[in-house]
């Protein structure tokens, strides 16, 4: 129940691409001497799962970065498909879970974003998905989602990097993939049972886009709702969010 995806092409995505290009260049020059580029920290809390459910974690802080990296992976995959690269199948493994699941329509996705971005995000990650069976029907508000803009921008810069004179350069593609996979580092902090996720969420400072009072209020309300004995866990709270808060997240004009 965090805010909508908020990263812009300028400055966040441009800076991210510069970091990745810089790391890729170092890998190409001397792979053994590359020191991972630190991208900040993320805070997670394990969600109780049962039976065939996929192990899951709630993102307390780091949602924007994790969403961005997922979009970047999808962009890499899409360019790999265009270049008929063997990496297209490999990249899909970082976006989609496989195996036996309790709720495959949800659990097959490595990342399950907030309701306002869910349809857009899944369309990027899994273009063949049946969106009507996964997310509620959303009205066309006439706005292009920032996740869509991010996807188009990242595909464009990756294409320019790996297509030389119209030909797909497998080596240049590999170095970008390696830069993302091995050359960037994020510290993952997992909360313990006695930690208060809401307090930690409010006090953490990140390098991303500042939280608004509405972002803090929304997170507080739905964290409290999750702790009030909701039957079925977050899926029922999703319905509460859709009915009472989702209209507030839509553009007013």
Regions found by a protein language model. Name each.
Residues 1-253:
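Covalent nucleotidyltransferase
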